[in-house]
Amino acid sequence: MQSIAQILASELGQPVQYVENVIALLDEGSTIPFIARYRKEQHGSMDDTTLRKLEDRLQYLRNLDKRRQEVKSAIEGQGKLTEALAAAIDSAATLAEVGDLYRPYKQKRRTRATVAREKGLEPLAQLLLAQEKDCPAPEAAAQAYIDPEKGVETAADALQGANDIIAEIISDDADIRKALRGLLMRQGRLRSLAATEEDSVYRLYYDFEQAIPKLAGHKILAINRGEKEGLLSVTVLLDREAALPALRRAVVKPGSAAMEFIKAACEDAYDRLIYPSLEREARSALTDSANEGAIGQFALNLKPLLLQPPVKGHVTMGLDPGYAHGCKVAVIDGTGKVLDTTVVYPTYGERQKREAIAKLTALCKKHGVAHIAIGNGTASRETEQMTVEMLRSLPGVSYMIVNEAGASVYSAGKLAAEEFPDYDVNLRSAISIARRLQDPLAELVKIDPKAIGVGQYQHDMPQKRLDEALCGVVEDCVNAVGVDLNTASASLLGYVSGLNGTTAKNIVAYREANGAFPDRKRLLKVPKLGPKAYEQCAGFLRVPESKNVLDNTGVHPESYGAAEKLLALCGCGDEDVRRGAVDGLMRKVQAMGEAKVAEEIGVGVPTLRDVVKELMKPGRDLRSDLPAPILRTDVLDMKDLKPGMVLTGTVRNVIDFGVFVDIGVHQDGLVHISQVCSRFIKHPSEVVAVGDIVKVLVLDVDEKKHRISLSMKQVKE
């Protein structure tokens, strides 16, 4: 039997040794970001996505192994565990297969077969099921089991009881269930019909049928939701005449007098027990698969949103639009510190709009505002139009519509109250919106990832699994970018490898009590932050103020000695690194030979390459290499759009059936999957990601329904 490491190696296409190394590192308490970044020699430079797949599958396979042992122990307790059964359980590849094998031995609720066994009909059932050549006719065999005292009045009663027992035995057969399950998933169809006459968003599924292998995940989730709301009736279909022959071949022995009786028992087993059970299993399996796909897509969309390039170092105004409570305003400096707040009422009438423009213009001039961030919620359209009007008298100032999802939840929460105790709840959301433009990652980590709103059906998914996946993405992003130890919030620090909520708060408390950290080593003085946590977190924390230039790089303290040897070998020093005067470092290393240099300084080649990159760009932010966000000074209206126009926009969301693109008209346009590119793709994420800047062609505009149809593939280069 293959070991867990061998199974994972085969699934991931990795050497067994690498997989064993990763398992050992995980078991020692190392995090995925730490393993991905600082243990490349041990796993061949697998990326964080592959490592998380490995971790997820490792957990599943360990749970599977645990369940195997539990099942064997339970069957052994009944004195029924044979070598063959134990071997079958050990080689079961899924929890469903283990469940099938355990099914005959599992304690059941009272069934028709249970009642028949209590009437003493088990021997009759076994006699008929054996289908020996000399087996008497069922009616004759049943005569011996007539017993009015037990409720078996006639031979027909005895045969009915025997049928019930045989049907349950057939239904509990692991091989039969596996074969029919496979047939259902290959040849079955999902059908949904209207359960009501009223119109709804589920009208597409009022008379819908599709082969199971071709079902898209978003359709499964939509149908599930429609069924839950009582608007759809859903069934799984399988051609009975295709299933029964397979069942008969597994059970019926030709030439026996009991053959026709057993055929009838097969049909009863299929109709009454097997099919309803497999239908439930199929629905569950389809839902699980759709959920995993949706969670994966949510995670895929979340990553580029978190890694949006920051617009740092500029005074920024945040506008949280609204009707009843007005438009909340906050001005922050280049570091995110609040300079001013107010509320204006541009939607109350023309006079109030003029007053709002005058007030905001004065604030912009007073503080030297460079950019304005506008939340995309209620009254965003009117606020954007007011801003554009205002910018005509403010040359050099630009604006951007910012996704405000989760801002209201954050502003009313404990975290915002601790951060801004002196500001009203409504003003806190304006501060958050401004900061989202300045540094999206630092601000978005304060919000539950589910609330960021870049997924489908996230409220229908298993929340624990969704949380795990999304928190993993946030963790990967935070550690990929790196965190300034002396300015980061506890929310941001909490996602750093090796840290948790408690140690993150302890770092902030230590910083407030003792002043800025002079270097990374000082972390070891933080309460509850021991050597293991330091090992895991140190490389991801930056200290720009440190005397040691390496403290402001992604070089891990364990590699400081190697980095210093490398600099000496290449005739460079700390000051050269600080001044950015080591551009030719990689060329020098390649000229000397990477393998030779790596051996000389005592690290592997992957670590050497990472050290060189960090020395060449100390304090670098990987987000600066990504396309800058589109800052606008003017606005389009839907009525301005005409088919054939080519516009530049930002991808806001990627889902199964297409891509939503912000083209600056407040209403995102849809690029249907068929219009994403000329080649066939299974999913739009094969081509684009959230945050991508794309050119689109306007295909159609429906002002009444607020729909804009776009194409990417029809844009002429």
Where do the PLM segments sit?
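Single-stranded RNA-binding regions, centering on S1/OB-family and related RNA-binding modules
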Residues: V543-E717
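Duplex nucleic acid-engaging cores and interfaces of nucleic-acid transaction enzymes
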Residues: T50-K53, Y60-G318, G322-Y423, A430
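Structured, non-catalytic alpha/beta "coupling" segments that mediate domain-domain communication
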Residues: A74, A88, G99-Y102, G226-D239, ...
